[in-house]
Curated annotation (Swiss-Prot):
It holds the Pfam family SPOUT_MTase. HAMAP family: 23SrRNA_methyltr_H (MF_00658). Its EC number is 2.1.1.177. This is Ribosomal RNA large subunit methyltransferase H.
């Protein structure tokens, strides 16, 4: 199974890149994850948000492997606690398909991307910078892996 994190945005702040690298390294023992960065559309005072969403959506679609199981990060998705995410991860690994997590740009995902999603996952009602979401996602995937292996990292319940 191949696992991708497709994230719109490049040139992340150093502290995000460092945090991502640390959790990516830790996660690699349980779930090899490849980060694919999608070039964001140009934004300025006269930019058209819908056009940006559609352009980024086309780039995301082009980056997808064949027949992926797509989990889209979406504010309207299902919120999961850490234990629920661990259960979902166990389910996803059992599917035998390429697993893809999709993080959109500042305005979100195109309808085309939402339409191919098998699941939508919400990190909650907070508004988060999309660059920070990649760090949160990789940490939560690592936490889920540690729950599944009874590693002491997760100290819930």
């Amino acid at each position: 199974m191949k696992c991708l994190l497709i994230a719109t945005g490049q040139h992340v702040p150093t502290w995000v890149a460092q945090g991502f690298a640390e959790y990516h390294r830790r996660l690699s023992y349980w779930l090899p994850l490849e980060l694919v960065e999608i070039e964001p559309s140009m934004r300025g005072k006269n930019h058209d948000p819908q056009r940006a969403i559609e352009d980024e959506g086309r780039r995301v679609m082009a980056a997808l492997p064949k027949q992926p199981y797509a989990v889209t990060l979406d504010v309207k998705g299902k919120p999961l606690n850490s234990e629920q995410l661990a259960q979902r991860m166990e389910h996803w690994r059992g599917l035998g398909r390429n697993l893809v997590f999709l993080i959109g740009g500042p305005e979100g995902h195109s309808q085309e991307v939402l339409n191919i999603s098998n699941e939508r996952w919400s990190l909650g009602p907070l508004t988060l910078p999309h660059m920070l979401v990649r760090l949160i996602v990789v940490e939560q995937l690592y936490r889920a892996a540690t729950i599944l292996t009874n590693h002491p990292y997760h100290r819930g319940k």
